[in-house]
Curated annotation (Swiss-Prot):
Pathway: Cofactor degradation; nicotinate degradation; propanoate and pyruvate from 6-hydroxynicotinate: step 8/8. Catalyzes the formation of proponate and pyruvate from (2R,3S)-2,3-dimethylmalate. Has no activity toward dimethylmaleate, malate, citramalate, isocitrate and citrate. GO terms for biological process: nicotinate catabolic process. It holds the Pfam family PEP_mutase. It is an enzyme of class 4 (lyase). It catalyses: (2R,3S)-2,3-dimethylmalate = propanoate + pyruvate. Its cofactor is Mg(2+). Belongs to the isocitrate lyase/PEP mutase superfamily. GO terms for molecular function: 2,3-dimethylmalate lyase activity; metal ion binding. CDD domains: ICL_PEPM. This is 2,3-dimethylmalate lyase. Keywords: Lyase, Magnesium, Metal-binding. Homotetramer.
Length: 289
């Protein structure tokens, strides 16, 4: 079963699919090894890990596809992949969908921001017209080859134009053929409940630590009607703090010996990365030497 079909199966059989965010292939491998349902490839995290820059639309489609391919290979579970605005108009979206599908992702996320886009919890976002985004969604739906490959439409209208506009767009995007609707940055549980009372089908909740939406437990999100929860920032925030603490300790203490209890061991890391499997392959296919 391909990962897109697996994702559809998960959504049809589970009440809640939890997808932690991966900012690189190593993170995706850890998430998959820990038994989570899916991985979310975060554009926010790709900008930071690949460029050392904030999420303001600097990555190209080619760069994002390469990152998606590596994350898919490492994860071993379905990948929901951020594709920003689709990198242009409906014509650009068609190529983006083809490339993401070939990369093996299960779900592509397209949003209705104006290029260059910004993180969905930053101020200063602008959105395209509802009609333009509907056209882009229709182009995405018509372009996919595998019918199990899912199109997720995100609207950033809540912050720029209010919850009513966001709901109107969510309904329009669903009618245009989107499989999953993602209304970004609702402000409070009442708005979150209203989203799920209004939008038919699958909906996604975005849990950003320090963002505009309250952090709720997955059981609470499920009770509100959500089907998928993503955690796009948690891994990279924890990793960043750990690195700051580590290198501060080295600068102050002239050694890393004092922070070894915060690290995985050499063997633990190699096990997580799958070294034993590589050794088995080397043994099975080794020629005489």
């Amino acid at each position: 079963m391909n990962t897109a079909a697996k994702m559809r199966e998960l959504l049809s059989t589970k009440k809640m699919v939890v997808a932690p965010g991966a900012h690189d292939a190593m993170t995706a491998k850890v998430i998959g090894r820990l038994g989570f349902d899916a991985v979310y490839m975060t554009g926010y995290g790709q900008s930071a890990s690949h460029l050392g820059q904030p999420d303001v639309g600097l990555l190209t489609m080619t760069e994002m596809v390469a990152r998606a391919n590596a994350i898919v290979e490492a994860a071993g579970v379905p990948v929901i992949a951020d594709a920003d605005t689709g990198f242009g108009n409906a014509v650009n979206v068609m190529r983006t969908v083809r490339e993401y599908e070939k990369a093996g992702v299960a779900v592509i996320q397209l949003e209705d921001q104006v290029m260059p886009k910004k993180c969905g919890h930053m101020v200063g976002r602008e959105i395209v017209s509802k009609e333009e985004m509907v056209g882009k969604i229709k182009a995405a739906v018509d372009t996919r080859v595998n019918p199990d490959f899912m199109i997720m439409a995100r609207t950033d209208a809540r912050t720029t134009k209010g919850i009513d506009e966001a709901l109107e767009r969510g309904l329009a995007y669903k009618e245009a053929g989107a499989d999953i609707i993602f209304i970004e940055s609702p402000e409070g549980e009442e708005e979150m409940k209203r989203i799920n009372e209004t939008i038919p089908g699958y909906t996604l909740a975005n849990m950003v630590e320090g963002g505009r939406t309250p952090l709720l437990k997955n059981a609470e999100l499920e009770a509100l009607g959500y089907n998928i929860t993503i955690y796009p920032t948690a891994s990279i925030y924890v990793a960043t703090k750990a690195m700051v603490d580590l290198w501060t300790a080295l600068k102050n203490d002239d050694t890393t010996a004092g922070v070894m209890d915060t690290m995985v061991t050499f063997s633990e890391f190699n096990d997580l990365m799958g070294l034993e499997k590589i050794r088995e392959v080397e043994h099975n296919y080794a020629t005489g030497r």
